[in-house]
């Protein structure tokens, strides 16, 4: 009886893994790259994200309590909260990939972990778009928007709308399973059986969550740069900070968000082709490229803290002072070779003088 039950369980397990195994057998890919690249990348991002967002939010709140909150500070604060919600889940993904893509934390935590990734992704895009519109209105239409851009009510209301809109976009994702039937794999998208219904949803959220905000952000910042270059009366510090912000946000979109959305859609389509029997080196390259872009997409949580430099003017001075303090402490604990040589030379001279005094005394 025990053998029969064991055989039944084994058959059930094999049948549950059949779709996954079939696609891997039809078009085998080297998953070793994923199992060392993503854990290493996620570990670095989690450490940088926790430190950067923690210090940045602390300084932003401390500064805002003294001088008062402004619209940009509210938007950046929401961006930091979205980053922290995501980076706290990265250690679980590190464990998942180091164990050979075996998820041991249960289906509920798998779904939450994947949800927080997409929540961070599209909340970051949403708030970066709001920041670009804020900069556009403040620089291109300064007189018309005087006072409106600095009050808190519009920025708070806008932040609430961004969160609500992101949750509405992600709501359909709850209907797609993230775990395989055996409860072993925790998919970042969904199981192979759901691809036909998942693809239209992903294409829709790519348009509403990324493409449209990307066009708005690019249009706003292109106009901002044109105005700043034409206007010679703009304060040089404001011009430099504004252009730095433009470059930073466009880098985030170009490096973190654009490649991910391109290769996520390509990877889903390649999985459909593989299920139909197709297999080529191009499909394998798409898979590897998609894994790289997943790491790049998470990198925005480590790069977003740079925006705190734009929202808090004294953060640079605080970080500089902190760096000098650390430098003095390190020099005290571990003096340089030149300092050690000088100290040894002084001691040698003092010893020689003492010896001469003793000789003279004798």
Model-found features: residue ranges?
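Alpha-helical membrane-protein architecture signal
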Residues: 33-40, 68, 73, 77, ...
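Loop architecture of class A 7-transmembrane GPCRs
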Residues: 20-31, 97-118, 141, 147-154, ...
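Alpha-helical transmembrane segments of multi-pass membrane proteins
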Residues: 46-49, 78-90, 158-170, 206-214, ...
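Intrinsically disordered regulatory tails of 7TM GPCRs
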Residues: 1-29, 274-279, 313-362
């Amino acid at each position: 009886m025990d053998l029969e039950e064991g055989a039944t369980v084994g058959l059930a397990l094999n049948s549950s893994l059949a779709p996954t195994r079939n696609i891997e057998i039809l078009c085998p890919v080297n998953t070793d790259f994923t199992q060392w690249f993503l854990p290493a990348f996620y570990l670095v991002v989690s450490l940088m994200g926790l430190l950067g967002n923690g210090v940045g939010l602390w300084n932003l709140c401390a500064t805002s309590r003294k001088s008062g909150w402004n619209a940009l500070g509210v938007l950046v604060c929401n961006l930091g909260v979205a980053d922290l919600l995501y980076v706290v889940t990265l250690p679980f993904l590190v464990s998942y990939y180091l164990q050979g893509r075996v998820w041991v934390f249960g289906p509920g935590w798998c779904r939450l972990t994947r949800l927080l990734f997409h929540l961070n992704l599209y909340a970051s895009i949403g708030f970066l778009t709001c920041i670009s519109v804020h900069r556009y209105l403040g620089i291109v239409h300064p007189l018309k928007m005087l006072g409106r851009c600095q009050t808190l009510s519009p920025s708070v209301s806008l932040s609430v709308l961004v969160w609500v809109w992101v949750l509405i976009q992600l709501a359909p994702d709850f209907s797609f399973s993230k775990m395989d039937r055996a409860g072993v794999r925790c998919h970042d998208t969904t199981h192979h059986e759901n691809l036909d219904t998942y693809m239209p949803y992903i294409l829709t959220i790519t348009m509403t969550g990324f493409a449209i905000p990307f066009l708005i952000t690019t249009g706003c910042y292109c106009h901002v740069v044109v105005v700043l270059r034409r206007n010679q009366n703009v304060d040089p510090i404001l011009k430099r900070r504004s252009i730095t912000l433009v470059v930073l946000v466009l880098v985030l979109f170009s490096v973190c968000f654009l490649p991910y959305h391109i290769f996520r859609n390509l990877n889903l389509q390649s999985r459909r082709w593989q299920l139909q029997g197709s297999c080529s080196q191009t499909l394998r390259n798409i898979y590897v490229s998609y894994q790289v872009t997943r790491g790049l997409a998470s990198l925005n949580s480590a790069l977003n803290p740079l925006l705190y430099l734009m929202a808090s003017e004294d953060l640079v001075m605080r970080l500089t002072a902190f760096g000098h303090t650390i430098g003095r402490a390190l020099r005290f604990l571990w003096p340089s070779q030149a300092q050690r040589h000088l100290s040894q030379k002084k001691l040698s001279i003092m010893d020689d003088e003492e010896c001469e005094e003793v000789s003279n005394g004798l």
